[in-house]
Amino acid sequence: MKLFVAKLGEIDYQDALTMQEKLLLLRQQNKVEDIMLLLQHPPTLTLGTRENRYNILVPEVELKRQGVNIFKSNRGGDVTYHGPGQIVGYPIVDLNGHGKSIREYVHKIEETFIQLLKEEYDLTASRESKYHGVWLGNEKITAIGCAVKRWVTMHGFAFNVNTNLSHFNLINPCGITDRGVTSLQKIFGQPQDMEKVYKQVITYFSRVFDFEPEIIDDKKLNEIVGRE
């Protein structure tokens, strides 16, 4: 199966959400192939469908002072952080071709990063029975929060590569108070090559989901999004 992959650089959360919603509709109508957006966001907190405002630990004025935006999202989960140095993936995938199981879909995203971390970085990551995501010990390195509409997915994952982890101190990530967060930069003590990691994400996601990836440029993406 083909998977279009679009790398967008850094993009505001609302702009990415608007693009996802357009692609979701097109995929539901079978007017486009499965597609994954890979990008980074400026410092942003997003609130999922199980949001609890008590998990934001500082006043909104302090968030503004630090240049952190807040958005309400229709993904699953509570509050999470996105920012530069974090690879965010938004797969718009028709689950009719992938077992029509939300649980299996999340499991495969987790498997993507478990394999990537083991084979590329010799890190043994795992799942947690209580929480979604990918963990190294008690620290989360990949957050997962999805939405599914008429069996087409949106939202997705956030992989901490060179993320500013201090911004996670503004929240209880995903409402979790007894665990931490980590990144490749923290583990190895130096920034990682983002382009290299982007390629790894594409490779392992495609392998786990049995996709043939095709990288598309901005022109192609705009042509796709323009289909109404």
From Swiss-Prot:
Domain of life of the organism encoding this protein: Bacteria
Pfam family, one: LplA-B_cat
Site (Lowers pKa of active site Cys): K140
InterPro entries, per database record: aa-tRNA-synth_II/BPL/LPL, BPL_LPL_catalytic, Octanoyltransferase, Octanoyltransferase_CS
Keyword rRNA-binding among UniProt keywords: no
Major localisation: cytoplasm
Keywords per UniProt: Acyltransferase, Cytoplasm, Transferase
UniProt binding sites for substrate: R75, G76, G77, D78, V79, T80, Y81, H82, A143, I144, G145, G156, F157, A158
BPL/LPL catalytic domain sequence ranges: 30-213
Pathway assigned in UniProt: Protein modification; protein lipoylation via endogenous pathway; protein N(6)-(lipoyl)lysine from octanoyl-[acyl-carrier-protein]: step 1/2
Compartments reported by the entry: Cytoplasm
GO biological process annotation, one example: protein modification process
GO molecular function, one term: lipoyl(octanoyl) transferase activity
UniProt EC number: 2.3.1.181
Annotated Gene3D superfamilies: Bira Bifunctional Protein, Domain 2 (3.30.930.10)
SUPFAM superfamilies per record: Class II aaRS and biotin synthetases
Reactions catalysed, as given in the entry: octanoyl-[ACP] + L-lysyl-[protein] = N(6)-octanoyl-L-lysyl-[protein] + holo-[ACP] + H(+)
Active-site residues, record numbering mapped to chain: C174 (acyl-thioester intermediate)
HAMAP family, alphabetized: LipB (MF_00013)
Comment field (misc): In the reaction, the free carboxyl group of octanoic acid is attached via an amide linkage to the epsilon-amino group of a specific lysine residue of lipoyl domains of lipoate-dependent enzymes.
Family designation: Belongs to the LipB family.
Function according to Swiss-Prot or TrEMBL: Catalyzes the transfer of endogenously produced octanoic acid from octanoyl-acyl-carrier-protein onto the lipoyl domains of lipoate-dependent enzymes. Lipoyl-ACP can also act as a substrate although octanoyl-ACP is likely to be the physiological substrate.
Name of the molecule in the record: Octanoyltransferase
Origin species: Desulforamulus reducens (strain ATCC BAA-1160 / DSM 100696 / MI-1) (Desulfotomaculum reducens)
Gene (name only): lipB
